């Protein structure tokens, strides 16, 4: 089997998705040993510089084994949208293919996968002044109150969002205040991810057969992050002076909980932080799995299998062979 020129073969995009802590990085590195791939990160947290521990960012040694793209793009004070991701990912994928290699999209930000597969509606750009005003309102009124306001002007979107989903409530109200139109009016009405495979694309999904295994792994990984210095990392971010708890970067799982723990006292209550961080990560994993179940064309590998990475490699070889034979 050879995929040295994937643009001429039947498969031009390979995706590796799964919930947080499912072993995507290890599987991607295993794939890089046998296929001519370059990794395109599909992770909304990895775009931020200076956020390494809490994002489980691939190490310098791991990134030296295979080229990685869309990591460390912006400062954590900046915003990064799904539309920006699509533009950056498409550019990176075209460059990878031009080098005769295969783009390997790896991550768990399912909204980014949806935007790339299904396209993204032409939403108005972010308005920093409006966002700042909404942040200020949230600090005095609380996000549930703003969610209630959203329900009066855009009940369709509000019904999809939790009252404390600050980032999405903020964006929906920002669109309403900027345009006078509800966010839901910009969408085609279909919020699920692609139910049919995009052309020349294959998706391997790492999913647990035992949810308890994933929960245990999440707890162990968050404990390891604390041991590795997550609290110190958040202290450094707080000391910059240009960040606050309502920024998208600081709402990332782990960072949000560590920031709140430091607000409550320094040194923080590490036992409570461990419990809250692991719980938030479990909720994230649940949402990711819900998205993945809406993609019936995916091919699954049990992430709790001892040889999960080897199974991913074998399946990827099979998928490439199948597409080459059909081309």
UniProtKB/Swiss-Prot annotation:
GO terms for biological process: tRNA modification. One of its GO terms (molecular function) is ATP binding. The record marks 109, 131 as: Interaction with substrate tRNA. ATP binds at residues 18-25. Monomer. Belongs to the IPP transferase family. This is tRNA dimethylallyltransferase. It comes from Methylibium petroleiphilum (strain ATCC BAA-1232 / LMG 22953 / PM1).
């Amino acid at each position: 089997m050879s995929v040295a020129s994937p643009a001429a073969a039947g498969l031009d995009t390979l995706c590796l998705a799964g919930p947080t802590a499912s072993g995507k990085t290890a599987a991607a590195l295993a794939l890089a040993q046998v296929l001519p791939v370059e990794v395109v990160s599909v992770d909304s947290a990895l775009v931020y510089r200076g956020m390494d521990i809490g994002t489980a960012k691939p190490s310098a040694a791991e990134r030296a084994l295979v080229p990685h793209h869309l990591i460390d793009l912006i400062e954590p004070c900046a915003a990064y949208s799904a539309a920006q991701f699509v533009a950056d990912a498409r550019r990176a994928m075209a460059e990878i293919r031009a080098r005769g290699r295969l783009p390997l999209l790896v991550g768990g930000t399912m909204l980014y996968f949806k935007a790339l597969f299904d396209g993204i509606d032409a939403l108005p750009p972010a308005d920093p002044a409006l966002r700042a005003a909404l942040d200020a309102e949230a600090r005095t009124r609380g996000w549930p109150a703003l969610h209630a306001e959203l329900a009066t002007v855009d009940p369709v979107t509000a019904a999809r969002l939790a009252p404390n989903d600050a980032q999405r409530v903020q964006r929906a109200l920002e669109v309403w205040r900027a345009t006078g139109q509800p966010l839901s009016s910009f969408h085609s009405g279909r919020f699920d991810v692609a139910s049919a495979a995009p052309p020349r694309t294959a998706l391997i999904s790492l999913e647990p057969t035992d949810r308890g295994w994933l929960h245990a792994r999440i707890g162990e990984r968050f404990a390891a992050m604390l041991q590795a210095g997550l609290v110190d990392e958040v202290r450094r971010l707080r000391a910059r002076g240009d960040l606050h708890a309502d920024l998208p970067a600081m709402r990332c799982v782990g960072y949000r909980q560590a920031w709140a723990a430091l607000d409550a006292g320094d040194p923080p209550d590490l036992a409570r932080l461990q419990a809250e961080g692991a719980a938030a990560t479990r909720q994230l994993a649940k949402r990711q799995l819900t998205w993945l179940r809406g993609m019936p064309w995916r091919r699954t590998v049990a992430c709790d299998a001892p040889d999960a990475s080897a199974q991913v490699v074998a399946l990827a070889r099979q998928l490439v062979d199948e597409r080459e034979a059909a081309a």
